[in-house]
């Protein structure tokens, strides 16, 4: 057996001791409700941090006192377990540990990070990459290989911080090498996180790699200044000034793809899904700046991601307004097998807030689905059902005042566009209306006309009366109200 094989065998033996040596352990770490058993002699031999820790605890192998408060990454102390029946009790055949097991609570690092640190201390080897396609906390992508996702980058950064805290420089260097390969395929916001970590830990090679990647991302200095310190932005601008590629890329549109790596066709679908999930989380948090960063730095297509449709369904008016003002999304983009626009969804939701903000940003009130249905047809159908049935299936709590206001807003927009086109106005959208077989309109036409006459006065008067009589205190739907409640959509776009 060669010396290399002997070292590998020794490494595996020590790693097996960490995994299966509970019966011989004399210390355990309690992290996130789980116990990680270890051995003081191994940890003290491999780490100066643990040597100093254990030298101050229980030198005569008596039941140890509670450990003193520890500096980051561990805090607090816990009592020792009893010999046979404690938490550090027997493993395997039921024998008791040679010495009472010391249990140390760890609260500032997570379980996966602690296990990685201990694996390196025992075997001299560790990898921040999770098992291929296996679960990794923080990553919800199915089948993700965790080679460049945000969760893998976060795990590597946490491991780097723990290695520095424990004084394990070999592990820190190993993680640095792995991060250098990860950032070349990571998103630009993850690269900026690694950039700041490399600055904190004074890792020059990692800093150089990340700074050049950010410089090549195409993000403007103003946008970088919102996410990075000004001195870091200045250094990135210096790199750009020295690079001939920066001058060539400068005239390009800020909404063209600026990603610094060619896409791998095998993983393009997973990349797209990951971007959409991150975009939706950003919209849920009203973080439009992050969405803008994804558009400019990663080439996110907001129309392909159905960003406006999602924001209309799940966010408030302000988020939809800010998203449309980015100028990177088509307000009339279509989604789903029927080709609905965001205005169709707002009409189905009976949300005056969404209808008004979409119309303010040039949504087409005459847009049709593949079935020839316009937003006005949707509202007329809901109104007909409300008049004849008293309630709309799936929208049992529909407010008639909101329905009237939505109908008036869309009808007014249709009249304006029809007048601008020079065509006669015949009942709202006659020139582009849907087939009569889709929405029966002949019997309810008179009711619809009377319903929409003077709708503003009816809306304001009934809203005030309802507030006085029932004390509900609803705000008038003038664009300053709260976002519409979640509703059932009979023909969702997904």
Swiss-Prot record:
<dbReference type="Pfam" id="PF12796">
    <property type="entry name" value="Ank_2"/>
</dbReference>
<dbReference type="GO" id="GO:0006355">
    <property type="term" value="P:regulation of DNA-templated transcription"/>
</dbReference>
<comment type="similarity">
    <text>Belongs to the plant 'ANKYRIN-BTB/POZ' family. 'NOOT-BOP-COCH-like' (NBCL) subfamily.</text>
</comment>
<feature type="domain" description="BTB">
    <location>
        <begin position="25"/>
        <end position="130"/>
    </location>
</feature>
<feature type="repeat" description="ANK 2">
    <location>
        <begin position="303"/>
        <end position="333"/>
    </location>
</feature>
<dbReference type="InterPro" id="IPR002110">
    <property type="entry name" value="Ankyrin_rpt"/>
</dbReference>
<keyword id="KW-0539">Nucleus</keyword>
<keyword id="KW-0833">Ubl conjugation pathway</keyword>
<feature type="region of interest" description="Disordered">
    <location>
        <begin position="60"/>
        <end position="94"/>
    </location>
</feature>
<protein>
    <recommendedName>
        <fullName>BTB/POZ domain and ankyrin repeat-containing protein NH5.1</fullName>
    </recommendedName>
</protein>
<feature type="compositionally biased region" description="Pro residues">
    <location>
        <begin position="61"/>
        <end position="71"/>
    </location>
</feature>
<keyword id="KW-0479">Metal-binding</keyword>
<dbReference type="GO" id="GO:0009864">
    <property type="term" value="P:induced systemic resistance, jasmonic acid mediated signaling pathway"/>
</dbReference>
<dbReference type="GO" id="GO:0005737">
    <property type="term" value="C:cytoplasm"/>
</dbReference>
<feature type="repeat" description="ANK 1">
    <location>
        <begin position="274"/>
        <end position="302"/>
    </location>
</feature>
<feature type="binding site">
    <location>
        <position position="139"/>
    </location>
    <ligand>
        <name>Zn(2+)</name>
    </ligand>
</feature>
<dbReference type="Pfam" id="PF11900">
    <property type="entry name" value="DUF3420"/>
</dbReference>
<feature type="region of interest" description="Disordered">
    <location>
        <begin position="469"/>
        <end position="494"/>
    </location>
</feature>
<feature type="region of interest" description="Disordered">
    <location>
        <begin position="421"/>
        <end position="443"/>
    </location>
</feature>
<feature type="compositionally biased region" description="Gly residues">
    <location>
        <begin position="75"/>
        <end position="94"/>
    </location>
</feature>
<dbReference type="GO" id="GO:0000976">
    <property type="term" value="F:transcription cis-regulatory region binding"/>
</dbReference>
<comment type="function">
    <text>May act as a substrate-specific adapter of an E3 ubiquitin-protein ligase complex (CUL3-RBX1-BTB) which mediates the ubiquitination and subsequent proteasomal degradation of target proteins. Transcriptional co-regulator involved in the promotion of leaf and floral meristem fate and determinacy. Required for the abscission of senescent organs, probably by regulating the cell wall disorganization in abscission zones (AZs, e.g. pulvini at the base of leaves).</text>
</comment>
<feature type="repeat" description="ANK 3">
    <location>
        <begin position="338"/>
        <end position="367"/>
    </location>
</feature>
<comment type="pathway">
    <text>Protein modification; protein ubiquitination.</text>
</comment>
<dbReference type="GO" id="GO:0005634">
    <property type="term" value="C:nucleus"/>
</dbReference>
<dbReference type="InterPro" id="IPR000210">
    <property type="entry name" value="BTB/POZ_dom"/>
</dbReference>
<dbReference type="Pfam" id="PF00651">
    <property type="entry name" value="BTB"/>
</dbReference>
<feature type="binding site">
    <location>
        <position position="149"/>
    </location>
    <ligand>
        <name>Zn(2+)</name>
    </ligand>
</feature>
<dbReference type="InterPro" id="IPR024228">
    <property type="entry name" value="NPR_central_dom"/>
</dbReference>
<keyword id="KW-0040">ANK repeat</keyword>
<dbReference type="InterPro" id="IPR044284">
    <property type="entry name" value="NPR5/6"/>
</dbReference>
<keyword id="KW-0677">Repeat</keyword>
<keyword id="KW-0963">Cytoplasm</keyword>
<feature type="binding site">
    <location>
        <position position="144"/>
    </location>
    <ligand>
        <name>Zn(2+)</name>
    </ligand>
</feature>
<keyword id="KW-0862">Zinc</keyword>
<dbReference type="InterPro" id="IPR036770">
    <property type="entry name" value="Ankyrin_rpt-contain_sf"/>
</dbReference>
<feature type="repeat" description="ANK 4">
    <location>
        <begin position="371"/>
        <end position="405"/>
    </location>
</feature>
<dbReference type="GO" id="GO:0008270">
    <property type="term" value="F:zinc ion binding"/>
</dbReference>
<dbReference type="GO" id="GO:0099402">
    <property type="term" value="P:plant organ development"/>
</dbReference>
<feature type="binding site">
    <location>
        <position position="146"/>
    </location>
    <ligand>
        <name>Zn(2+)</name>
    </ligand>
</feature>
<comment type="subunit">
    <text>Homodimer. Interacts with TGAL5, TGAL7, TGAL8 and TGAL9.</text>
</comment>
<keyword id="KW-0863">Zinc-finger</keyword>
């Amino acid at each position: 057996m060669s010396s290399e094989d002997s070292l590998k065998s020794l490494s595996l033996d020590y790693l097996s001791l960490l995994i299966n040596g509970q019966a011989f352990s004399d210390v355990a770490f309690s992290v996130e409700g789980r116990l990680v058993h270890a051995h003081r002699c191994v940890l003290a031999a491999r780490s100066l941090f643990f040597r100093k820790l254990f030298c101050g605890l229980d030198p005569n192998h008596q039941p140890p006192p509670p450990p003193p408060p520890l500096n980051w990454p561990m805090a607090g102390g816990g009592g020792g377990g009893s010999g046979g029946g404690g938490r550090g009790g027997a493993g395997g055949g039921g024998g008791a540990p040679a010495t009472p097991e010391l249990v140390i609570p760890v609260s500032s690092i997570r379980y996966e990070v602690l296990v990685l640190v201990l694996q390196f201390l025992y075997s001299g080897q560790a990898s921040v990459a999770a098992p291929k396609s296996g679960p990794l906390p923080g990553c919800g992508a199915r089948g993700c290989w965790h080679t460049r996702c945000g969760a893998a980058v976060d795990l590597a950064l946490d491991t780097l911080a723990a290695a520095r805290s424990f004084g394990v420089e070999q592990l820190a260097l190993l993680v640095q090498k792995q991060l250098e390969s990860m950032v070349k395929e990571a998103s630009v916001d993850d690269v900026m996180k690694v950039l700041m970590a490399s600055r904190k830990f004074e890792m020059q090679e990692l800093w150089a790699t990340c700074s050049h990647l950010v410089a090549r991302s195409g993000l403007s200095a103003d946008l970088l200044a919102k996410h990075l310190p000004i001195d870091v932005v200045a250094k990135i601008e210096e790199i750009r000034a020295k690079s001939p590629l920066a001058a060539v890329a400068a005239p390009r549109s800020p909404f063209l793809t600026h990603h610094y790596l060619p896409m791998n066709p095998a993983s393009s679908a997973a990349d797209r899904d990951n971007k959409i999930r991150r975009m939706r989380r950003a919209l849920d948090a009203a973080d439009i700046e992050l969405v803008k960063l994804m558009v400019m730095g990663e080439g996110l297509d907001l129309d392909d991601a159905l960003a406006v449709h999602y924001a209309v369904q799940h966010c408030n008016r302000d988020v939809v307004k800010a998203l449309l003002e980015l100028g990177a999304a088509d307000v009339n983009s279509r989604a789903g097998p029927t080709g609905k626009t965001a205005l169709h969804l707002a009409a189905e939701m009976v949300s005056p807030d969404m209808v008004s903000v979409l119309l303010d940003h040039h949504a087409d009130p005459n847009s049709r689905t593949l079935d020839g249905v316009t937003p006005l047809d949707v509202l007329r159908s809901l109104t007909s059902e409300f008049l004849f049935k008293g309630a709309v299936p799936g929208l049992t709590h529909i407010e008639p005042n909101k329905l009237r206001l939505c109908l008036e807003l869309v009808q007014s927009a249709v009249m304006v566009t029809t007048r601008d086109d020079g065509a006669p106005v015949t009942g709202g959208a006659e020139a582009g209306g849907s087939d009569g077989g889709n929405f029966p309109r002949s019997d309810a036409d008179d009711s619809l006309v009377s319903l929409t006459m003077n709708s503003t006065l009816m809306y304001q008067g009934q809203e005030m009366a309802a507030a006085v009589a029932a004390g509900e205190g609803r705000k008038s739907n003038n664009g300053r109200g709260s976002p519409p409640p979640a509703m059932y959509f009979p023909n969702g776009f997904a």
